[in-house]
């Protein structure tokens, strides 16, 4: 069977080495004679797995000692509500920067839980010469006392990524569901980072939360116990039965990432993948990117065909060529190639060759 390259935005492809190992030990994990899905989450063998997973993630991201690492339920949307309930209390306010679909969704959830009067927003995307770009205002000039500032540094639907640091007088909370572990970041600049696992970490059903000590003293609202960060810390992410198979696969992804050189090497690869794909889009009049170069996502490359009548044919022929899940999000249309950490350079090169051939045939 010829190679299939999966460009799905999430759940996304996992490293083949991780999938092969999971397949090999599916029925007999760690010499136990049973699957990892069948062992107690409180067994010494599984506890050892969780401890190694946290240690590897701390090493990969250089997470300081005053941060807790939590493995939780709920995905990104679950964290939309958890952030509000854990930190706003009865009288807190928060500021949300909006740069695309997911940050808008976070605002909607926050307003539903806390009320619109407690949530302020700033739209940081504008269109300049037909391209969407990000402009972050001087936040130090805002004379308000917010519990936190929330933003999404990579918008999967819109293909927009923010690479600059946020200079905020309030604790910064970042939804890094789609770009965590894709490039080096300074964790100490954030009060909290959360990420749904299903793009760069593992399968859906798990979310990673990295939270600074001082955030946990903020007043909270009544909420579900399984989304309470304080209870999660006190119980080592095991207040209730966690998604053990997803945790296991996340641990294997962290191990794999270390084996290929860590985040620094992955960042170099991701830069090269994005460079080759955007270069193809820019060099051919057949395709167009609607995002300014400085804000083009390295993870989610969105583009349009100048002749939209060819969209269906493009997708059909791509499927035949082994290039799957290239259809853009229904809200924006066009195409989207998600090239997360697990996507090899070969997959991007194969896509570029297909795009060049398709353009030559239909120009």
From Swiss-Prot:
Belongs to the class-V pyridoxal-phosphate-dependent aminotransferase family. SerC subfamily. GO terms for cellular component: cytoplasm. It is an enzyme of class 2 (transferase). It comes from the Bacteria. The modification N6-(pyridoxal phosphate)lysine is found at residue 199. It catalyses: O-phospho-L-serine + 2-oxoglutarate = 3-phosphooxypyruvate + L-glutamate; 4-(phosphooxy)-L-threonine + 2-oxoglutarate = (R)-3-hydroxy-2-oxo-4-phosphooxybutanoate + L-glutamate. It is found in: Cytoplasm. Keywords: Amino-acid biosynthesis, Aminotransferase, Cytoplasm, Pyridoxal phosphate, Pyridoxine biosynthesis, Serine biosynthesis, Transferase. L-glutamate binds at residue 42. It comes from Shewanella halifaxensis (strain HAW-EB4). One of its GO terms (molecular function) is pyridoxal phosphate binding. Homodimer. Its main location: cytoplasm. Its cofactor is pyridoxal 5'-phosphate. This is Phosphoserine aminotransferase. Catalyzes the reversible conversion of 3-phosphohydroxypyruvate to phosphoserine and of 3-hydroxy-2-oxo-4-phosphonooxybutanoate to phosphohydroxythreonine. Pathway: Amino-acid biosynthesis; L-serine biosynthesis; L-serine from 3-phospho-D-glycerate: step 2/3; Cofactor biosynthesis; pyridoxine 5'-phosphate biosynthesis; pyridoxine 5'-phosphate from D-erythrose 4-phosphate: step 3/5. InterPro entries: Aminotrans_V_dom (IPR000192), Aminotrans_V_PyrdxlP_BS (IPR020578), Pser_aminoTfrase (IPR022278), PyrdxlP-dep_Trfase (IPR015424), PyrdxlP-dep_Trfase_major (IPR015421), PyrdxlP-dep_Trfase_small (IPR015422). Its EC number is 2.6.1.52. Binds 1 pyridoxal phosphate per subunit. HAMAP family: SerC_aminotrans_5. Pyridoxal 5'-phosphate binds at residues 76-77, 102, 156, 175, 198, 240-241. One of its GO terms (biological process) is pyridoxine biosynthetic process.
């Amino acid at each position: 069977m010829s190679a299939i390259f999966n460009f799905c935005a999430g759940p996304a492809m996992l490293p083949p080495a991780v999938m092969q190992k999971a397949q090999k030990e599916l029925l007999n994990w760690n010499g136990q004679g049973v699957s990892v899905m069948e062992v107690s989450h409180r067994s010494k063998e599984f506890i050892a797995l969780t401890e190694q997973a946290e240690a590897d993630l701390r090493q990969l991201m250089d997470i300081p000692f005053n941060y807790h690492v939590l493995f939780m339920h709920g995905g990104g949307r679950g964290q939309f509500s958890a952030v509000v309930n854990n930190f706003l209390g009865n009288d807190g306010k928060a500021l949300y920067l909006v740069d695309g679909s997911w940050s808008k969704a976070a605002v909607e959830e926050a307003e539903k839980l806390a009320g619109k009067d407690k949530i302020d927003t700033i739209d940081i995307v504008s269109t300049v010469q037909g391209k969407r770009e990000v402009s972050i205002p001087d936040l130090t000039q805002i004379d308000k006392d917010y519990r936190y500032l929330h933003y999404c540094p990579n918008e999967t639907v819109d293909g927009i990524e923010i690479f600059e640091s946020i200079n905020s007088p309030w604790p910064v909370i970042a939804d890094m569901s789609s770009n965590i572990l894709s490039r080096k970041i300074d964790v100490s600049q954030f009060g909290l980072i959360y990420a749904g696992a299903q793009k760069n970490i593992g399968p859906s059903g798990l979310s990673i939360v990295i939270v600074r000590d001082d955030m946990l003293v903020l007043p909270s609202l009544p909420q579900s116990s399984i989304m309470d960060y304080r209870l999660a810390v006190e119980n080592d992410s095991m207040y209730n039965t966690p998604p053990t198979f997803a945790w296991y696969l996340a641990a294997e992804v962290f191990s794999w990432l270390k084996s290929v050189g860590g985040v620094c090497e992955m960042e170099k690869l991701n830069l090269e993948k994005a460079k080759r794909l955007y270069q193809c889009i820019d060099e051919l009049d057949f395709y167009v990117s609607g995002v300014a170069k400085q804000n083009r996502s390295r993870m989610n490359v969105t583009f349009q065909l100048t002749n939209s009548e060819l969209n269906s044919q493009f997708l059909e022929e791509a499927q035949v060529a082994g290039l799957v899940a290239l259809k853009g999000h229904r809200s924006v249309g066009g195409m989207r190639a998600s090239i997360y950490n697990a996507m090899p350079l070969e997959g991007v090169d194969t896509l570029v060759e297909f795009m060049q051939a398709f353009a030559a045939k239909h120009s």
